[in-house]
């Protein structure tokens, strides 16, 4: 019964919106919009603690600022996006050099802005027996040829909207244009419905800043999309060790109160603002 219901819901959702199938990457030596490529331990969410290869794309639809929690911890892919430096062959090579790793964390930025890369990675993962987790805010639905193993969904609530005249990490002042860009696809509910229905599994990983306003938005979103509490992982805001640790007890208590799971951000606790860890 559950399988048939899932199929019916998927068919209904996909039929309501035309979706363009992503392409493939023919040239494995071409430089792609990948800013970082490294081995690490997954430090957030339901697959925490597993050795993985992180593939970080550059470019993002959002400009997240969490007040005292700081800017997005990967601001160098979004607010001030760097240029990609890696090829698909570099991904092949890192798995060849680390044959015991069978996980991939596709992150950003916003990796769903790169549909052909996402699709090619699902082919590679299917051939190699690799489990892909894609971290996404849900702005774009991609009907990849093979579903992702896990959608790690972190939608952007009102606590992520930057404020006028706040200074970005590289000294730019926030203006209305930046705010409008951030809000344009901040909660694309239709794309989120399609994504959760199509791909293999998901967890919901909202960023919590300690306010009741944010918690209300987190819970409203969970109810709207029929997300079970056991698939919800509350994560504290913070782009550095000091701010993050301040939020740990607040978010732990709230997760317990709400009946959610809780996740830390171990890479920030261990290495603070160091990149590629």
Model feature map: region roles:
Residues 92, 96, 101-103, 112-277:
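Conserved AdoMet/S-adenosylmethionine-binding subsite of the radical SAM
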Residues 16-42, 51-52, 58, 62, ...:
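Conserved Radical SAM active-site core
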């Amino acid at each position: 019964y559950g399988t048939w219901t899932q199929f019916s819901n998927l068919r209904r959702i996909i039929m309501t919106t035309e979706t363009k199938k992503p392409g493939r990457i023919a040239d494995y030596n071409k430089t792609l919009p990948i800013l970082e490529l490294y081995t690490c331990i997954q430090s957030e969410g339901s697959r925490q603690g597993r050795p993985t290869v992180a593939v970080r794309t550059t470019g993002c639809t959002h400009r997240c600022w969490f007040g005292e929690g700081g800017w997005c911890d990967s601001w160098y892919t979004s607010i001030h996006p760097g240029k990609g430096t890696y090829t698909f062959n570099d991904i092949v090579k890192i798995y060849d050099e680390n044959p015991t790793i069978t996980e991939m964390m596709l992150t950003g930025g916003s990796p769903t802005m790169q549909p052909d890369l996402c699709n090619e990675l699902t082919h590679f993962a299917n051939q190699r027996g690799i489990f892909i987790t894609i971290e996404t805010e849900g702005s774009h639905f991609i009907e990849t040829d093979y579903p992702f193993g896990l959608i790690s969904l972190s939608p952007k609530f009102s606590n992520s909207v930057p404020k006028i005249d706040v200074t970005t990490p590289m000294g730019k002042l926030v203006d209305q244009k930046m705010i409008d860009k951030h809000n344009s696809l901040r909660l694309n509910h239709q794309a989120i419905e399609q994504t959760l229905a199509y791909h293999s599994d998901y967890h919901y990983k909202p960023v919590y800043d300690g306010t009741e306003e944010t918690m209300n938005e987190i819970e409203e979103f969970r109810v709207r999309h029929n997300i079970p509490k056991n698939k919800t992982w509350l994560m504290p805001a913070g782009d550095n060790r000091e701010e993050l640790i301040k939020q740990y007890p607040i978010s732990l208590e709230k997760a317990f109160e709400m009946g959610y799971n809780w996740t830390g951000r171990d890479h920030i606790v261990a290495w603070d603002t160091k990149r590629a860890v």
